[in-house]
Amino acid sequence: DGEQALQASLSVKEKLQIALCLEKAGVDIMEVGFPISSPGDFKSVQTISQNIKNSRICSLARCIEKDIDTAGEAMSHCDFFRIHVFLATSTLHMESKLRKNFDEIIDMAIFSVKRALRYTDDVEFSCEDASRTTMDNLCRIVEKLISCGVKTINIPDTVGYTIPNELSLIIKNLFERVPNIHKSTISVHCHNDLGMAVGNSISAIQAGARQIEGTINGIGERAGNTALEEVIMAIKVREDILGLSTNINHKEIYRTSQVISRICNMPIPSNKAIVGSNAFSHSSGIHQDGVLKNRENYEIMDPSSIGLKKVKLNLTSRSGRAAVKYYMNEMGYKDSDYNIDELYVDFLKLADKKGQVFDYDLEALAFINKKQDELEHFCLKFFSVQSISNNLSTASVTLLCGDKIYTESSTTSNGPVXAIYQALNRITHFPIILQKFQLIAKGQGKDALGQVDILVKYKKRQFHGVGLATDIIESSAQAMINVLNNIWKVKQVNKNLKNLKK
């Protein structure tokens, strides 16, 4: 279902990679494709079913013989698997889409379930558009299908129309009115058109549902599906209220989210609950001080519980002395090594000018002469690149290093940006490892600027760099120059500290 949100279909290899991540995270059941839809989807379901051992594989099928047979064939190498058949049950869908009455719908559903049971004893049935289906009809079809051997009854809010107390009432009614309901697991499948997918899912499990269908990061058609990571952590954090648990390895949540975001080319919003970059980030000085004293003051869950290493305090003009002091202590400096009052004044000036300040900026403010700090040691005087499709890229750069000028060239098969970075590295000889490269368009049309943000690793420390220009090659070069100057400042700090100790 999540793949419906993507502009292009995923390859078999990409789907398998996602499936392996989900398996490692401890997902109970993964619905991995719709085999009848294309040969590629059939191959994906087949490949995943052959490689996944610890999660149950499920395949989707309409109430059509060929769909069901194809689903069974795709998973025939599995010892255990599930076939998930679905059919619309709302009056609107029956009349305008299927052109059938409810008795015909029941007959189709029963026939399809019996067909699926030829391949596996684990059959799930979805009453498509269940949230807009009359309660009488819903109870009637659910009872008949459970009698046929359906193990899981799914109640989808197909168009994201319902609200939490309404879905809760639907589930409660099923438990009260369907006599054989205890023979099947009740599932919910919510969409996020009104922004209530997670809330609806939680209300459903409070009413008795025991399976939640969703996607990591909430990706899916239209406004998306239930974000599984949000439901999972809600169940964990509010176990006192819900009294439930899952089999999920919570420490794999963040990594799985990042992998899926990258493969699907769908960036995670910074304010996304649980996995967004700001989810455990604190900028306010009051909040930062509170978190440093006791993280529970402003955090309801431990970042490490989803696989993050530690709290992230953003150093901005809103940060207080406590945050600045915390970063200096994290870098190994004692209070006696610097003047916190002077440092904080200089920090605020830099934060107003720069926006976000990093640990190495604090070092420079504390230990480098202010006039010296304002000077950029490295300055790009000239660059040229030549790149031919399906061939090597060549770059030549002229770099001002203090009062000396150096020129260097480089040739690589990895493109013009890599060629420029190699040429710069030949001049500076800094053993840099590029960890992240991100290009963002600023503005529109021919005058748009390309902002390049990079993250590099140098001797166990991370350094950020930003470049902005209409030419993305130039902005890439500027970002690396930014990094080189930050590294140089750290080297100057170390040099000055050594001189002080002599």
Swiss-Prot record:
Membrane spanning residue stretches: none
Under the heading InterPro entries, the entry gives: 2-IPM_HCS-like, 2-isopropylmalate_synth_dimer, AIPM/Hcit_synth_CS, Aldolase_TIM, LeuA/HCS_post-cat, LeuA_allosteric_dom_sf, LeuA_bact_synth, PYR_CT
Q: What keywords tag this UniProt record?
A: Amino-acid biosynthesis, Branched-chain amino acid biosynthesis, Cytoplasm, Leucine biosynthesis, Manganese, Metal-binding, Plasmid, Transferase
CDD domains, from UniProt? DRE_TIM_IPMS
One GO MF term? metal ion binding
| Localisation per UniProt entry | Cytoplasm
Q: Please give the SMART domains that the UniProt record associates with this protein.
A: LeuA_dimer
Query: GO:BP terms for this protein?
Result: L-leucine biosynthetic process
Residue positions binding Mn(2+):
1, 189, 191, 225
PROSITE patterns, alphabetically? AIPM_HOMOCIT_SYNTH_2, PYR_CT
Q: Pathway, per Swiss-Prot/TrEMBL? A: Amino-acid biosynthesis; L-leucine biosynthesis; L-leucine from 3-methyl-2-oxobutanoate: step 1/4
Cofactor(s) this protein requires: Mn(2+)
Kindly indicate whether the keyword Chaperone belongs to this entry: no
Q: What does this protein do?
A: Catalyzes the condensation of the acetyl group of acetyl-CoA with 3-methyl-2-oxobutanoate (2-ketoisovalerate) to form 3-carboxy-3-hydroxy-4-methylpentanoate (2-isopropylmalate).
Can you tell me which family this protein belongs to?
Belongs to the alpha-IPM synthase/homocitrate synthase family. LeuA type 1 subfamily.
Q: How does it assemble?
A: Homodimer.
The protein's name: 2-isopropylmalate synthase
Q: Which organism is it from?
A: Buchnera aphidicola subsp. Uroleucon sonchi
Coding gene? leuA
